[in-house]
C-alpha cells in the first residue's frame, strides 16, 4: 500500500467504526440544502486522506445519523494524529445519503450532500441536516455515484489514502446495480471500500456486508446503532467551553465566505454541544488541529498558511471594524 502500512488503514477504519455510542440527546434536523458546491481542496504536495461517507437515511437509521454527527470530530482527531513522512495528511471528506424515499426513485434514492472538502464545518452542517424517511437501500447505486461523481486523486500520486465507508442495515445486494462491479472498479483505482453493518455480526455477513468489504479490499465492522453511552460531566467542562469561545474570537472572516463561515462555525458549535458533551469537546480539540482548515475564509489562518498576502487583500472584503487599518510585518 503506497500510503502506509495496513495497520494504519485499520486504525482509520476503527476510528470511523466508533459509531457505536448514541448521543444522549437528539438534535432536530435543520433545513439545509446539499452543499454540492464547496471550496475545492487546495492542491498540496503532501499526503492526503480522502474519505467518502455513505450513510443509510431510511427510517431505521436515526441512531446511525446522530452517531455520525458527533463522531465526525473523533475521526478528525484520529487523522490529525497520523504522520506520513513527517507530515500530517490533508483530510478531505465527502458525504452521501442513500435509502431515503424523499429522494427520487429515478436517482436510486441516492443524494450527494457534500463533495470532497477540507471545510469540516460544511460536513457537520450537512450531517445535522439529514433526516430519515423509509426507502430502498441500494448499496451498489450509492457506490457507483461515489466512485464516479467525486474527484478522487489519481493513482499516480504517492501518499494518498482513498477510503469509502458505507453504513446501513439492509442486504448489501439490494437493487439492480451489482455491488461487485463497483468494488472491483474501486480496487483498480486503489479506493478501499469499508462497510459498517448496523446489526449483529453474523447478520451482516449473511447479507453480504462483509463480502462488500472483502471484495473492496477494505474492512468489515458491525455496530449496535442504538447503544447508549453515558455522558459524564467533568470539572473541566466549563473551562473548555470558555476556551472554545476565546478561540472563536481569533477568527477574522474575510471575502465572500467570511461572514457565512463564521455563522456556520457558531451554529455547528451549538448543534454539537446540544447533541453530545463528548462530541462537542472532540470538536473543540479538532479546531486546534491542522485538519480544521479555515484558510479559505479566515484571515489569520490564510496568512499563517501562506494562501493570503495581506498586501493583496481588498479592504472591502474585511469586516467593517478592520477596514482602513494599516498592517506591519514586524
State what each model feature region is.
Residues 6-17:
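Bacterial N-terminal signal peptides
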Residues 37, 44-110, 115-165, 173, 203-207:
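Von Willebrand factor
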Residues 45-60, 121-129, 189-190, 312-317, ...:
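Acidic/histidine-rich, surface-exposed loop or edge segments in extracytoplasmic proteins
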Residues 47-49, 89-93, 157-164, 188-194, ...:
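Loop/turn elements at helix/coil->beta-strand transitions in domains of secreted/extracellular proteins
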Residues 61-64, 103-107, 172-180, 202-208, ...:
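Extracytoplasmic/secreted cell-surface and envelope-processing proteins
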Residues 170-215:
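VWA/integrin I-like adhesion module and closely mimicked acidic/polar interface patches used
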Residues 214-216, 220-311:
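C-terminal "exit" segments of structured domains
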Amino acid at each position: 500500500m503506497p500510503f502506509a502500512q495496513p495497520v494504519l488503514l485499520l486504525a482509520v477504519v476503527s476510528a470511523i467504526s466508533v459509531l457505536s455510542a448514541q448521543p444522549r440527546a437528539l438534535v432536530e434536523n435543520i433545513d439545509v440544502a446539499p452543499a454540492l458546491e464547496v471550496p475545492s481542496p487546495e492542491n498540496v504536495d503532501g499526503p492526503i486522506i480522502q474519505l467518502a461517507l455513505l450513510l443509510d437515511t431510511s427510517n431505521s437509521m436515526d441512531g446511525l445519523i446522530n452517531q455520525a454527527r458527533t463522531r465526525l470530530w473523533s475521526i478528525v482527531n484520529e487523522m490529525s494524529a497520523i504522520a506520513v513522512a513527517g507530515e500530517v495528511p490533508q483530510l478531505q471528506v465527502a458525504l452521501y445519503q442513500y435509502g431515503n424515499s424523499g429522494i427520487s426513485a429515478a436517482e436510486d434514492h441516492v443524494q450527494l450532500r457534500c463533495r470532497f472538502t477540507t471545510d469540516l464545518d460544511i460536513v457537520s452542517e450537512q450531517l445535522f441536516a439529514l433526516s430519515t424517511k423509509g426507502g430502498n437501500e441500494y448499496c451498489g447505486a450509492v457506490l457507483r455515484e461515489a466512485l464516479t461523481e467525486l474527484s478522487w486523486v489519481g493513482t499516480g500520486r504517492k501518499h494518498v489514502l482513498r477510503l469509502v465507508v458505507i453504513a446501513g442495515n439492509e442486504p448489501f445486494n439490494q437493487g439492480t446495480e451489482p455491488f461487485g462491479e463497483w468494488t472491483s472498479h474501486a480496487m483498480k483505482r486503489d479506493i478501499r471500500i469499508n462497510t459498517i453493518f448496523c446489526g449483529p455480526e453474523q447478520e451482516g455477513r449473511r447479507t453480504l456486508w462483509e463480502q462488500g468489504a472483502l471484495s473492496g479490499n477494505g474492512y468489515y465492522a458491525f455496530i449496535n446503532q442504538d447503544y447508549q453511552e453515558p455522558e459524564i460531566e467533568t470539572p473541566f467542562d466549563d473551562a473548555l467551553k470558555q476556551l472554545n469561545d476565546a478561540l472563536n474570537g481569533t477568527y477574522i472572516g474575510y471575502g465572500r465566505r467570511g461572514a457565512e463561515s463564521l455563522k456556520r462555525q457558531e451554529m455547528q458549535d451549538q448543534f454539537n454541544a446540544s447533541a453530545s458533551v463528548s462530541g462537542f469537546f472532540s470538536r473543540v480539540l479538532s479546531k486546534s488541529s491542522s485538519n480544521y482548515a479555515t484558510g479559505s475564509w479566515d484571515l489569520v489562518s490564510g496568512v499563517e498558511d501562506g494562501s493570503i498576502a495581506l498586501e493583496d487583500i481588498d479592504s472591502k472584503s474585511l469586516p467593517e471594524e478592520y477596514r482602513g487599518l494599516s498592517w506591519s510585518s514586524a
